[in-house]
């Protein structure tokens, strides 16, 4: 559980708080995008917590690239294409379902 907290803190630090003023998408991020990014990070936490509660090791969760995908949201989704953020919720669900099926 503590390892998950540290991993989510890393996602928040790198994917949400750290800013690159020289990057086109990161110079200014609309409030709506910021809110959706935090909702997606919370969704990731909730799904990972559910997996850990089923005794899946954090190392197994880290084998996936889901954490890196979430970190890269602000660069991968243009500020004028916020509907693409919904795809990340789908990716988290796929990640969750895959691990549940593989390790049930």
Report residues per predicted region.
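Conserved catalytic/coupling modules of large nucleotide/cofactor-utilizing molecular machines
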Residues: 1-104
């Amino acid at each position: 559980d503590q390892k998950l907290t540290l991993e989510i803190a890393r996602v928040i630090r790198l994917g949400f708080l750290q800013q690159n003023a020289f990057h086109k998408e990161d110079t200014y991020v609309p409030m709506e995008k910021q809110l959706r990014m935090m909702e997606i990070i919370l969704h990731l936490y909730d799904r990972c917590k559910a997996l850990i509660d089923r005794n899946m090791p954090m190392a197994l969760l880290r084998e996936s690239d889901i954490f890196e995908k979430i970190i890269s949201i602000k660069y991968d989704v243009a500020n004028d294409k916020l509907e693409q953020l919904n795809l990340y919720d789908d990716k988290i669900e796929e990640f969750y379902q895959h691990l549940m099926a593989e390790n049930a």
